[in-house]
Amino acid sequence: MKFHEMTYTRPDINALLATCQTLAARAAAAPDGDALVALYYEQSQAFADYTTASQLANIHYTCDTRDAYWKAEQDFFDANGPAVANAQVEISRAFLSNPHVDALTHHFGTTCVAGMKNAVLGMDDRTVDLQKEFNALVSQYQQIYGGALVELDGKQLTIPQLGPYKEDLDPAVRRAAYEAEAGYFDAHREELDQLYTQIVKNLNQQAQVLGYKDYSQLSYVRMNRIGYGQAEIQAFRDQVARDVVPELQKVMAMRAKRTGIPHPTFTDLPIIFKDGNPKPIPGYQARMDAARTMYHELSPETAEFIDFMQDNELFDVESRPGKMSGGYMTSLPSYKAPFIFANWNDTSGDVDVLTHECGHAFEGYVAQRDPHVPADLECPAMESAEIHSMAMEFLTAPWHHLLFGKDSEKYALLHAEDSFVFLAYGCAVDEFQHIMYQNPDLTPDQRNAEWLKLEKKYRPWIDFDNLPFYGRGAGWQRQLHIYECPFYYIDYCLSTMAALQFFLLSLEDHQDAWQRYLKLVRRAGLASYTELLQTAGLKVPFAEGSVKGIAQQMTQWLEAHQV
């Protein structure tokens, strides 16, 4: 069914909540394991129509935020979502209370029961008011960030609109863009500092209500991390600091040589090539045709997938007035259809977002067609879900010439270098947040001092050159995740470690790498991060010595592919 033919009906929330109560009672009383498994499929299906309606409303709203009808529908789901989420937690609580609960682990694998336990441990009626307060604090941050208008080049510009100026080949233009941005954040320094103080206090209070020492502990439950905790994450970060950072210093030296900027400062970092970044081919249809060819040649599975997506109008990727920024993939379970949303802007990022979201969508498409996989276990936790997308960016590389033409070698270098270099920043963000929540009484200046220490630890090549805002250690306040979804950022690092391994495997034997990826995808949300990596024969980055070899291979490839 084509997207425009999909019908929307606002769900009856009271009827859904009544169904939830019935399902919870039946889950608690199920007489044996078989009955419990059957009921799990039933409760999963019970939410399919609600999820489909909520996602249809969200897609229509984000595609045109000015449409009053879809705005009202989005408001409806925002208002009723918490009640539905609480009802789902109560169903989980009922399943867990059943003496036959082990049957779910036997049938579905490790993540089903572990995920329900995390849902129950991370939510409680006693934290509802604190959660509302946290949402309000995040909204205040979004207003400060989203409301930014700065003066540059005789124009009033938003923060995203500064992007082209930051990449200008003239260093004076770049510096002016960064100073304009810094001036805005410095002007709101007190508000941003105060908001973060309140956010740390709020989330630590939530943690203490639920019996945890601080939010750094609770976050592992809320992020549904299964099979690892703080010790494993610290072991990974330690390896990045010890084994990856020295390799990245070599990579940054190569970049300095390539760009002809011998002593780059912070404002020089966006310059990747002397003559500008790679540009994809122009034109929506030309790109869509290239994507169809690419996925037809990659595998029979992706050929079927891309035909379904394009034939059913399941892409909305062109930017236009009224459309929300960003990119995402979502699922419409009642139609077994993924949907991809993006905002192309004629940069190499257009190809990043296409291949990235197609990775998410392909996994969703495969899981939706597997009768063994219930709808709520189609997708794994975030650190694993991002493997599908990030690995797809690399596994489509043999066809990137279709999308970049003469610039395909530049794109290959840019993409691999960016992915590798990101590990250092991602680990700095994660370690910073652990320090903040474990030391909630730090003053704003002390917080900034901690950030500068981490910059030296993870990105020692950076010279802030007395730049306002960044130079005083406040650059972390630009990172939305730190305010909006604390402790999420390390997920990108964990998935990058898997994606880089798929990249290196594909250089040796692309077909073997693809078959390993397909195995991982087919496990859907039924396996943990560690289990998924083991399924594909990849190294788990928590193990001592697992990161060094990958880092050295990446440096060698980058050295051999300078353009």
Q: Which positions does each model-derived feature cover?
A:
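Post-HExxH zinc-binding segment in Zn-dependent metallohydrolases
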Residues: 242-243, 368, 379-407, 421, ...
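C-terminal, non-catalytic "cap/extension" segments appended to globular domains
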Residues: 110, 115-117, 227, 318, ...
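Zn2+-dependent metallopeptidase catalytic core
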Residues: 237-251, 280-307
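Short pre-active-site segment immediately N-terminal to the catalytic Zn-binding motif
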Residues: 280-284, 335-355
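A well-structured
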Residues: 1-278
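Catalytic zinc-binding patch centered on the HExxH motif and its immediate surroundings
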Residues: 164, 280-282, 315-337
